[in-house]
Amino acid sequence: MFGKILDVHDYNVKIENLTKRVESSYLGVHIVFEEKFYLVGVITSMTLDAIECTLIGEFTNGKFNNGIIHKPSSSSLIRLINKEEVLLLVGSQELDSKDNLYIGKSLVYDGFNVSARMNDLFSNHFAILGNTGSGKSCCVARLLQNIFYNNETAMPTNAHIVLFDAFGEYNTAFENLGQIPNMAFKYYTTDVKRATNNLVKIPAYFLEVDDLALLLNANDPQQLPIIEKALQLVYIFKSQDAKALQYKSDIIAKSLLDILSSGKQPTQVRDQLIAVLTNYNTPDINLDTIIAQPGYSRTLRQCLNIDNQGKMPAVSLVVDLLSAHAKTDLDKIEVEHNFAYSLEDLYQAFEFALISEGVLSSEKAFDMANTLKVRLHSIINGEHGVYFDVDHFMTKEEFMIDFFTLPENRQRTCQIINMNFAYVDDRFAKILTKIYSKIFFNFATNLKRRASFPIHIVLEEAHRYVQNDTDVEIIGYNIFDRITKEGRKYGVILGFITQRPSELSKTALSQCSNFIVLRMYYPDDLIIIKSMSAKVTDESIERI
């Protein structure tokens, strides 16, 4: 069938067709160029005179290796691939083995299944790419079903797979998993109207500076100190400690002293002091606070009066009152962080954080900081506040146990968790995925025994969440980039399912080792696929 080599150009080889027949059944079949090396090519076209193939790899030491290092010579023996070599391409046919994952049936080689080694596929970050309608969701569901439903020898009881489901379509695929011994499935939803005890919830007191920066859409690193101060204050104010009231007075006093020393005109100073005290006050410092002198008492408001010479004659009394309360050191107030607080509590802390940081004296600084407070207020009174409404305290370790076990049996671990994000907008879903992923990653990094609690985070419509965004500029890192670079050694693996790889974070995608590529059309996406590996050729791109 195969004659001499007529031409070799890049990865394409043209071979003389000795049969002088065109047989379409040979298209897609592999051939071997046998000499010192066993080069593998796939037949791409046939004419009466020539057969064209594309080199895709080599057989070395009983394994198939993608990529081309060598080229065939004129002395190469050319033949069709044999059965043993087909197995090296399509994978083991021992599907009952716990080491092998059934993927599907070969369209080229009748009677052969396609499989992958379980550990090789799921021990590295992976991506499943394909246009809308190409079968990505079906592919994911089928792969996971094959792990749990078609595996009778060794069930993966230690698996923890979290599916961030953009459309709520995976629930029916895994709802019967609990019928298998020692297996369990759990379902969370963002559907507030229908959820019972399975509504997506993140305790407000879990939110750290970077989480709040994302939630409040901070766009400048200078906004972070306000968030840090609010997180300090919320525990002090919520604790009901006697020092909490004292510290509130301290914050107000220091802010008012700054205004008094600003050098502004007395009328401006008076108006600003009254404005602050109207909104921020305590029983010790307010406009009606009595300032007593021998034989004469006045309210603080009266002490702010301006005489006919444009001066504030009683200002020294105001300074003495404020100085008496401006003595509290925040760092010396020790409060246990073992109680819950709400977004409403955090909002009150933001109020005092604004004046504590002195932003009232700068219009620009105030606008920048006040934006965060306004956004927090919008979340509290909007449709997203309910997802942070947890009124009881739990540690993050307790949260993880609660998240990954059945509510009726905390000894029963759930191997698949489906998170239905179909009822929230893309921006909020992106924030939730980042916060959850950070919680998972931090939990894994703090385990005494590294990688003892493996977690697979699978992101449907990953291009909505894993983007080249501004996280690095604002908070210093992107959680998905961090997980792709560091997560594997802690047992945290990311899986991206997307129709737009060109919109994914380049850092995250570059760390993926395994790819399943379905039908793709968009030129920018095809360029990304080709750049993923030197093993992807132009001919491979044409085939998808």
How would you name each of these model-derived features?
Residues 158-162, 413-416, 452-456, 490-495:
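Loop/turn-to-beta-strand initiation segments
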Residues 168-172, 203-479:
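P-loop NTPase motor domains
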Residues 187-192, 202-206, 515-524:
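Conserved AAA+ ATPase "SRH/arginine-finger" region at the nucleotide-binding site
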